[in-house]
Amino acid sequence: QDSRHRFYLCVTQVLRSGGTMRKRMAAILAAAMLAMGTFAGCGSVADADTVEIVNVSYDPTRELYQAYNTLFEKHWEEQTGQKVRIIQSHGGSGKQALEVANGLDADVVTLALEGDIKTISDSGLIDPGFTSEFPDDSAPYTSTIVFLVRKGNPKQIKDWDDLLRSDVSVITPNPKTSGGARWNYLAAWYYFEGQGESEENITEHMKTLYQNVLVLDSGARGSTTTFIENGQGDVLIAWENEAFLSMQEEPGEYEIVVPSASVLCQPTVAVVDEVVDRRCSRAVAEEYLNYLYSDEAQKLAGENYYRPADQDIAK
């Protein structure tokens, strides 16, 4: 068992390293891990024809992970000869984090912000230091916050100040359940702070903004549905990727307004240590997140309107 543990640590180090070495060695090491069973008691998983993992993610990543899972399934089978079945769960990031912390078995989490994963880590399920487990602070792609308005921008919404007007109705998710909503809040606060406003004034501005919100959905995709399908609101505060996806699906019906100030959003990923060790799924779970940094996956992120962490591909 000690030799297997040492071997596992070696494997993990190589899989987490970047560049072509990781790509060359991943197949050999992953196959060897499966052959050895990695830990005592994990032999049945290693010998199984199919392994299953659960990815608990936030609302607007549905299309990204639907495509990525197909890519990863092919990659894993080519590397190891074993099939992998990936179960997806999507919802407001804060709500998803609480579900995992309260017992929803997730092998990996791909959530909207570091704080939501810290909620799970604080429950003892994820080891501390998760932001250093993968490159770029464990954020394989980023985004920002923009406004989506209806064709012609009838209310002439140009910046955060306009969202305080009494004639403007706003759609944004609930910060209590949605990670995207918290990024929205931070972006607005950052703008008013940059205008030299006092904390007291900014707090009042935020109250006014939220008084203009018609519906506080639990997640970003719900807010998009409220704005697009239900036709409510003059402006949707949205992830950049979600806004571009909406324009792709409804060409000519909407416009993106880029406010003068916003924030760089860093969705974070992590392996749920307690779950993968219990389910003997660490090898496939770690490679699932590692492969998000591959050229193929980074290009896929860009195609889904995320900003790839790999700056060469982002160009």
Predicted segment positions?
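Ligand-binding pocket segment of bilobal, Venus flytrap-like solute-binding proteins
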Residues: 195-260
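Alpha-to-beta junction loops
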Residues: 103-110, 167-168, 230-238
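A conserved helix-loop-strand patch within extracytoplasmic ligand-binding domains
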Residues: 121-193
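Early extracytoplasmic/lumenal segment of secretory-pathway proteins
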Residues: 43-123, 133-134
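Residues embedded in well-ordered beta-strands
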Residues: 146-148, 255, 268-270
